[in-house]
């Protein structure tokens, strides 16, 4: 079920009226659904643009069409038009399922570690152009990672590993007892902080 506030409906209706195209609606879709990069996309949809498999939600003065493949990702979404503390108004979409759901506690440790790495750790490392990949998760709970991008060869990789990644994984995935680095940092060609300048 998707909730669309009255304010959001009024906002959409005004935009559609300005376009002046009979039968125009709004199409909602999930982009890169199930990944950390997931986002919602809204766009005008003329009747000729529709594929026929969209879910139609009748609103006050227009129809919101949800792309069929996006329906599971948009379940529980809320669309609103809010006034920010600065006085500016903004359309907001909260779609709690769009990035996927964390694996159940009954899932394997490997699945849970990969989910935390992809959905929590890598988005933070991306701000420095870095990333990590899970190379191995041993039966006794030792996670072996390989750094890439700006983290490959970075002088702060050890700090990131121990104070960031290891703490996060041990706190979020029961059974993880240690995190190790399998990266040959001497081969990094574009580190965020070169190893010889880290103190």
Swiss-Prot record:
Assembly and oligomerization: Homodimer.
Species annotation: Xanthomonas oryzae pv. oryzae (strain PXO99A)
UniProt name for this protein: Fe/S biogenesis protein NfuA
Highest taxon, organism lineage: Bacteria
Residues noted as binding [4Fe-4S] cluster in the record, renumbered to the chain: 151, 154
Family: Belongs to the NfuA family.
An MF annotation (GO) of this entry: iron ion binding
A GO BP entry: protein maturation
